[in-house]
Regions:
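ATP-binding pocket architecture of kinase catalytic cores
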Residues: 14-190, 204-208
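Catalytic-loop of the protein kinase fold
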Residues: 190-192, 197
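Activation of the activation-loop gatekeeper triad in protein kinase-fold domains
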Residues: 213-219
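Hydrophobic residue at the +6 position relative to the catalytic HRD Asp in the kinase catalytic loop
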Residues: 200-202
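Active-site activation/catalytic loop segments of kinase-like enzymes and analogous catalytic loops
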Residues: 226-272
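Short, small-residue-biased leader/transition segments that mark boundaries at the very start
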Residues: 2-12
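All-alpha amphipathic helical-bundle segments outside canonical DNA-binding/catalytic cores
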Residues: 139-140, 274-281
Length: 281
């Protein structure tokens, strides 16, 4: 199947913009465009850059989530290009970066429609019933929130520099607060874990319509509100302070975009999930 895609006709290979972890290449043929994804070279963290898993999640999603790119094939023969890789169809559309291009001509109403369409994709993903499907194997079950808090605290302690004083003013206070205030899981569903505008593909003929969701390398089974919270962590709005605005990587500040409060309220209404004050911390 891989050979049928990659052999037999003239091809142009280009490094594709996007993908901050795994490497993404555009394979341009006379009659079609494909995308090849492979891990970076060098030493990799255990369990990271699992190309088979990333491929299999998207393949399993295809029957129940139309916004995933069709998978072509996975290859674990390192003799082909030096690593595992997979090939998928290219979703031809618009990917937003830091700002909305002026040439799209989107007014405030269209920007709001784009924003709610993005949240609708997250709601749709979290609404998938994974029980009894292939998707059920991509997670560890209940306890996702605790695993994240415990896991990241442990990584911090292993990575900190020896000989540096820790205590007052260190990250220990933050970790203690997170441990004390972590909410109970509200559900167990497939979560994307990197849901932001530069991982969405918009239709050329209607940029308020989402036709694709990309970069599934961190997807897993977990708490949907953790996925929502992760998305909001990137959500820099127009009235944020200078430091926050300086970290903005997507056009969430644009006139018409929902604020963070409006995002979680819209999500709660669309998903039917109650979000408590503790969940908002």
């Amino acid at each position: 199947e891989i050979s049928a895609c990659l052999v037999g006709s003239e091809m142009c290979i280009r490094d594709s913009t996007g993908g901050a972890s795994n490497l993404t290449y555009l394979l341009r043929y006379p009659t079609r465009d494909l995308i090849l994804r492979r891990p970076p070279a060098g030493t990799k963290a255990k369990g990271a850059h699992d190309m088979r898993r990333e491929h299999d999640i998207q393949r399993a999603l295809a029957p129940v989530f139309p916004a995933v790119a069709p998978m072509i094939a996975f290859c674990d023969d390192a003799g082909v290009i030096g690593s595992d890789f997979y090939v998928m169809e290219r979703l031809d559309g618009i990917i937003l970066r830091k700002n909305i291009p002026a040439e799209l001509g989107l007014g405030e109403a269209e920007v709001r429609a784009l924003c709610t369409a993005a949240i609708d994709q997250l709601v749709a993903l979290h609404s998938i019933d994974v029980a009894g499907t292939e998707l059920e194997r991509f997670g560890k079950g209940e306890g996702y929130v605790k695993r994240q808090v415990d896991g990241w605290s442990a990584r911090y302690r292993k990575a900190r520099t020896h000989g540096v004083r820790h205590g007052t003013g260190s990250f220990e206070k933050v970790m203690a607060w997170l441990d004390e205030h972590q909410p109970h899981d509200v559900g167990n569903c497939l979560i994307h874990n990197d849901f932001r505008f530069d991982n969405l593909v918009l239709a050329h003929d209607d940029p308020t319509r989402v036709i694709g969701v990309l970069d599934w390398e961190m997807a897993t089974l977990g708490d949907p509100l953790m996925d929502l919270g992760g998305a909001l962590a990137y959500w820099v709005q127009a009235d944020d302070d200078r430091i926050m605005r300086g970290s903005r990587r997507q056009p969430t500040h644009a006139p018409g975009m929902l604020t963070r409060d409006e995002v979680w309220q819209y999500y709660a209404h669309a998903s039917g999930r109650a979000i408590s004050p503790k969940d908002q911390l």
